[in-house]
């Protein structure tokens, strides 16, 4: 009887350890997703700054170069946003907005991307009105 109790204790301890490892791994996944989303938002922020500079550039050539660099930064943000979404579906809106950047002019995406990144960097998943 004592051997059976000891065996059950070992099995219970092993199951508890497995559950703890699984919970820890899933928490790490969400942390990694947040980190990837923040990486994407840093690129997005840089892109928006370049885009706004392109609007007031002194020459057409400078404006075109800045706009192209801004577009390139938006596309570079797609990788981290995709990885964030793969780990945590709550970042899907960010990834989807970035995917639209190849079809929609940046001027129409700026506000949406800024708000989504505001949520990424906040401590709550909601924005105050």
Question: What is the predicted role of each segment?
Answer:
Residues 56-67:
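Amphipathic alpha-helical segments
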Residues 49-50, 68-129:
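Extracytosolic low-complexity repeat regions of secreted or lipid-anchored proteins
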Residues 29-31:
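Bacterial signal peptide processing site
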Residues 24-27:
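C-terminal motif of bacterial Sec signal peptides marking the signal peptidase cleavage site
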Residues 21, 33-34, 110:
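Residue-level signal for mature regions of secreted extracellular proteins and peptides
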Residues 36-58:
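Post-signal peptide N-terminal segment of mature Sec-exported envelope proteins
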Residues 2-15:
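Bacterial N-terminal signal peptides that target proteins for export
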Residues 15-22:
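Hydrophobic helical h-region of N-terminal Sec-dependent signal peptides
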